[in-house]
UniProtKB/Swiss-Prot annotation:
GO terms for molecular function: lyase activity. The modification S-carbamoylcysteine is found at C346. Its EC number is 4.2.1.-. Pathway: Protein modification; [NiFe] hydrogenase maturation. This is Carbamoyl dehydratase HypE. It comes from Bradyrhizobium diazoefficiens (strain JCM 10833 / BCRC 13528 / IAM 13628 / NBRC 14792 / USDA 110).
Length: 346
């Protein structure tokens, strides 16, 4: 039987419907592009699934979809974002990420060159996070039926013994820690989407937080009540969600919340509130007061936590409000975002 040609015309070629048909062209795409980008022992077996060994203990699993527009943005692209976002969802349980799956829905006519860049960035992000993309799927839809490329992922990880992070564990007096500046990702996406040029380029904060989380857990142990990554809806949505789940409220100090000057200026120009803008490389931790100092020091000692800050505390509040003392000496309620401020941000 004649072997199929594995070589794709990466420079000039485009995806067509045959690349999702299950035939020779699809085999070329998988072997010549995805396997080269993600290559590992599991994918090399060519099965429709991947088997892996697990040790006794608690596992976590997550799933996510990525429809960001534009596909390429300052600081990353949909591929690196898909890995970072999935790894971070696992890491917020204090877990070590292990394995990912990735499914691609590709629009007919999508350039191989762009797909290769995206796949390579996924592979690089996975290697950096010490995770493996061990199974996946590819579908191709007609022109006009998708906006270039959508990615769906799933991931699994293992939780360290004795660690159980949950909003139910939050208590009055717990400190609210943020790992760095807010709004970088959302403003980077919006500036690229609207072709806005600022004096200082605003770059997405998209990054995998697993190593930062491991350092925090080592420093704070069971003093860490829970962690969340403030993605869509930003810090405001995250803290409102935690307030509802924990039956508490939060008091924040605006002056303590880190926002880069360029991001603050861009938000003012665009009519955005940094507290509502998405982040893809930050986390919020609710930490017992006796552990907060050690956890904050561990965060600041890590490259992804240099701008970490203690921004407030958990309080008793039957209404579960998130309130903030403003820099002008007043106060305001930080509510959920109403409507859609930044669509297709991740």
């Amino acid at each position: 039987m004649k072997a199929y040609q594995r070589k794709l015309d990466i420079r000039n070629g485009c995806v067509d419907l045959s690349h999702g048909s299950g035939g020779r062209a699809m085999a070329q795409l998988i072997s010549g592009l995805f396997h080269e980008a993600f290559g590992n022992e599991w994918l090399a077996r060519g099965n429709d699934q991947s088997a892996f060994d697990v040790r006794a203990g608690r596992m976590v699993m997550t799933t996510d979809g990525y429809v960001v527009s534009p596909l390429f943005f300052p600081g990353g692209n949909i591929g690196s974002l898909a890995v970072h976002g999935t790894v971070n969802d696992i890491a917020m349980a204090g877990a070590k990420p292990l394995y990912l799956s990735a499914s691609f829905i590709i629009e007919e006519g999508f350039r191989f060159a762009d797909l290769k860049l995206i796949a390579e960035s996924m592979g690089a992000a996975a290697r950096e996070a010490d995770v493996h993309i061990i199974t996946g799927d590819t579908k191709v839809v007609e022109r006009g039926k998708a906006d270039g490329l959508f990615i769906s992922t799933a991931g699994v990880g293992v939780v360290p013994d004795g660690l159980d992070l949950s909003a139910e564990k939050a208590r009055v007096g717990d400190r609210v820690l943020i790992s760095g500046t807010l709004g970088d990702h959302g403003v980077a996406i919006m500036s690229k989407r609207q072709n806005l040029a600022f004096e200082t380029e605003i770059v997405s904060d998209s990054a995998s937080l697993h190593d930062l989380v491991a350092r925090m857990v080592q420093a704070g142990g069971r003093g860490i009540r829970l962690m969340r990554d403030p993605t869509r809806g930003g810090l405001a949505a995250t803290l409102n969600e935690i307030a509802q789940q924990s039956n508490l409220g939060f008091h924040l100090l605006e002056e303590a919340i880190p926002v880069k000057p360029g991001v603050a200026a861009a938000c003012e120009l665009l009519g955005l509130d940094p507290l509502h803008v998405a982040n893809e490389g930050k986390l919020v931790a609710i930490v017992a007061p006796e552990a907060a100092g050690a956890v904050l020091a561990a965060m600041r000692a890590h490259p992804l936590g240099r701008d970490a800050a203690d921004i407030g505390e958990a309080v008793a509040d039957d209404h579960h409000f998130v309130q903030m003392a403003t820099s002008f000496g007043g106060g305001r309620i930080v509510d959920w975002l109403s409507g859609e401020q930044l669509p297709r941000i991740c």
